């Protein structure tokens, strides 16, 4: 990419070297515009333009990121780790802010580039899945005593399953696209699990599940893997860091990581929860947590997997009923296919729940 005046103006606002030699698009993310900067010193940085249409409160978001990364740096230093590789490091502007606002009102930020490490979009083998589990567990461990209530809720009610259920019922009632009659079976699947939707929210309200710092996008591609050792070194993409439940972060990883089928698989006979991969993740996650979670949190990990899968399927069905406005679709009925896949996974997990609990008990005793 040509280093135009706009890029020069933006980078000059940050505390960086003088001679920028290259600016190229970087990574496979779909939300923010991301570039890798190279300076004549050989040092690299990541420059990002934040997507305000998705993250409508960029200042609050950056306050979350700043607070969490500063905390992580302190913990990593105390543990004798490498702060430049084991957490994201924000570069401040010359005004002392973690972001710069350009003439068009766009928000930009700069991170140190983590050298000799890679993000993978797909799980190559179970070791990758295990490493991501260790990393997200370790993330919980390092942030266990962070005051989660001080974080901004940048996406309100993101994993409030009761709120999602209310929105679903409204979509069924309004039936703006006249699709409800064709999906009565799927609608009934949700209504039959009204009590399920309340389980984790009720436990949080009753103080049985503590508020934690949660990542809310616990995919493999948000983990940096060291090129030399193959070990996970850093959790990235902290834009959705918010107060939440640890079991939800765990559950979302299982939802897509331990499924035997693609998220939009039409042949539902191919869709189930792979208990071997589930066990791989449980082992890594509990190891990474290092005793940071409560007994109740550990006991509810299987329920987190079921509920996150149920919530996701319900969101796909809600979007289908409302006319496919939220999730991008690539064919007719795409959201319905996604919904059916998630519901098949829920049913399979419900049937395997006792085994899923046994696996957690096996590793929480270690």
Q: Where in the sequence are the language-model features?
A:
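Juxta-kinase regulatory segment immediately upstream of eukaryotic protein kinase catalytic domains
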Residues: 1-24
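Charged catalytic carboxylate motif
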Residues: 6, 60, 64, 131, ...
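Protein kinase-like catalytic core scaffold
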Residues: 45, 86, 109, 212, ...
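Helix-rich C-terminal or lid/interface subdomains of diverse kinases
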Residues: 163, 279, 283-360
């Amino acid at each position: 990419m040509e280093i135009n005046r706009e890029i020069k103006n933006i980078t000059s606002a940050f505390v960086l070297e003088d001679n920028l030699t290259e600016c190229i698009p970087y990574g496979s993310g779909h939300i923010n515009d991301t570039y890798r900067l190279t300076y004549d010193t050989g040092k690299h940085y990541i420059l990002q333009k934040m997507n305000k249409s998705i993250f409508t409160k960029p200042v609050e978001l950056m306050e979350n990121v700043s607070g969490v990364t500063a905390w992580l740096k302190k913990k990593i230093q105390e543990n004798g780790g490498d702060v430049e590789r084991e957490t994201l490091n924000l570069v401040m502007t010359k005004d002392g802010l973690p972001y710069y606002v350009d003439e068009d009102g766009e928000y930009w930020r700069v991170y140190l580039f983590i050298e000799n490490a890679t993000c993978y979009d797909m799980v190559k083998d179970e070791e990758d899945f295990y490493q991501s589990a260790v990393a997200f567990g370790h993330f919980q461990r390092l942030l266990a005593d962070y005051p989660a209530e001080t974080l901004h809720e940048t996406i309100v009610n993101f994993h409030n399953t009761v709120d999602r259920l209310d929105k679903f019922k409204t979509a069924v009632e309004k039936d703006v696209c006249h699709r409800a009659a064709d999906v009565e079976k799927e609608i009934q699947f949700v209504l039959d699990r009204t009590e399920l939707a309340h389980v984790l929210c009720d436990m949080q309200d009753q103080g049985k599940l503590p508020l934690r710092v949660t990542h809310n996008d616990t995919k493999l591609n948000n983990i940096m893997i060291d090129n030399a050792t193959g070990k996970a070194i850093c959790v990235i993409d902290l834009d959705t860091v918010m107060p939440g439940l640890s079991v939800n972060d765990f559950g979302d990883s299982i939802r897509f990581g331990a499924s035997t089928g693609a998220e939009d698989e039409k042949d539902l006979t191919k869709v189930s929860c792979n208990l071997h991969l589930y066990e791989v993740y449980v082992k890594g996650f509990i190891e990474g947590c290092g005793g940071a979670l409560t007994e109740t949190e550990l006991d509810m990990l299987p329920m987190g997997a079921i509920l996150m899968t149920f919530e996701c399927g319900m969101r796909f069905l809600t979007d289908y009923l409302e006319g496919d406005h939220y999730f991008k679709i690539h064919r007719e009925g795409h959201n319905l296919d996604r919904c059916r896949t998630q519901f098949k996974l829920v049913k399979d997990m419900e049937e395997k729940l006792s085994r899923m609990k046994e696996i957690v008990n096996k590793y929480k005793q270690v």
